Amino acid sequence: MRKKHFNMILKLALISSLLALAASRTHLTDCLDDHKYCVGLPRGCVGTECNFAFSSISNGTHTEIEIFGNSVIDKTWLAIGYSADKKMEDDFVVFCIRDDAGTNMNKLDQMAGLAYNGKHSNEMTGTIENIKKNKNDKFGLDLEMKEYEKDEQTLYCKMAHRVEPIIDRFNVSKVEILMAKGTWMKGGLSYHGNTRNNTGIIDLSGESKHKRKNSAVGSLALVSSAITFLAAKMLF
């Protein structure tokens, strides 16, 4: 009887894991929307095949972002940074963490947060939970966790935040994006080292991407250009 019960638990766990993976794959490959931007590493990857993937869709006041990573073990953070240029100084950082022992899956506000990067040194604003508790969202990004999924070595996070603070800070709506990964240490972000990449520019204003002809070839080209819009190396 115990063996049957144990096998049933294993089956349910496997089904849950597969459903989570399928959900992430659906989200991350939904890049045909004229307003949605997607990038991934390595070049040519799609969805959960990527080592690192990011998407953004904006309505002009808020943007919804997705961050996905493979080979993500315990005590790891994934992040994207918004910057006015490729130097990646004076930029906003939105991060998502995997801390199996230090976080509670029932409290999603522990899983993500904000930091501010000066000259390549992160100043922690805090997790969403701490920001709300301490009322220290000084830039008014109003970050919110929408979905959080983790598997044996994968991490998927969907978040939303206001875009006005970023646009006002840089005085532009089109900003450079950095994707990075590092070790979560003592409640903070360790330096990412070489595990980073400048992936291009996104428009936070919510304006449509350049429209192509309404054809199967055009649609496939749009997916290809959206997913592979990046240029350099990222080491994992």
From Swiss-Prot:
Residue ranges the record marks as coiled coil: none
GO cellular component: extracellular region
Keywords noted in UniProt: Glycoprotein, Secreted, Signal
Compartments it resides in: Secreted
Signal sequence annotation: 1-24
Keyword set includes Secreted: yes
Domain of life per record: Eukaryota
Residues that carry a glycan: 59, 171, 197
Name used for this protein in its record: Uncharacterized protein C44B7.5
Species per Swiss-Prot/TrEMBL record: Caenorhabditis elegans
Lineage: Eukaryota, Metazoa, Ecdysozoa, Nematoda, Chromadorea
